[in-house]
Amino acid sequence: MKLTSYIRSYECPQETIEGAIELFGMCKDMDFTVPGKVGMGDVDKTIKDSEDVYLESLPMFPLHEFGMDSYVKHIDEACQDYLDSIHLGYYQLRMLGLPQIQHYPPKGGYFQEHIDSYSNSTCNRIIGYITYLNTVDNGGGTHFPHLNHTEQAVAGKTIFFPSGVTHAHKGVVAPDEHKYILVGWFGPSC
C-alpha cells in the first residue's frame, strides 16, 4: 500500500534566515546552547548530534530584532494554508511554544528514524515544521523512509508534515557541511 505524502513546502522571509543564524551565534558565544535531546529529554549523540537553542528560554533577548516575530507570523499563516491544502482547514491549531534553532555539525544529525508525537509530553504535536536556514549541497536534508522521499536542505524552505507515524523521518548526514534549522510544532488550540 502506498502512503500519501502530506508534506508541503513554503518560502521563509530572508530576514528570518539571517536573524536566526545570528541569534544562534550569539547564544553559542554566551553558552546558551544545549546538546540536542531525544526521547524523554535524554542526550544521546549516537541518536542525535546537535546543539540546540530553545527560544522559549531566552526571555531577555529582543527576539523581534532577529526577525523571530515576523517568522512566527509567517509560520502561523503557512500552517493555516497547509491545513487548507490537505482539506483540514477547519481545525484550529496553535503553535506549541516558540521554535528551536538546531545546529548540526559536519557528520552530525538526527540519525534515528523518529516521529514527533511519541510520548505523553509530545502527544499533542499534530503538525511539525522545519525551516532550513542554509543550503547544504551534500546531504543535510530530511528523509521520510515510509514515503521514500527526501527534502533537500535549501535556505529559506519551510516544510510542514504530520507528526505521526505516517511521516516518520530522520536527518540526512552532511559529511562536510554545517546545517542550521528552525523546528517546531502545532497542536490543539484547546
Which residues are covered by each model-predicted region?
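Non-heme Fe(II)/2-oxoglutarate
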Residues: M1-Y90
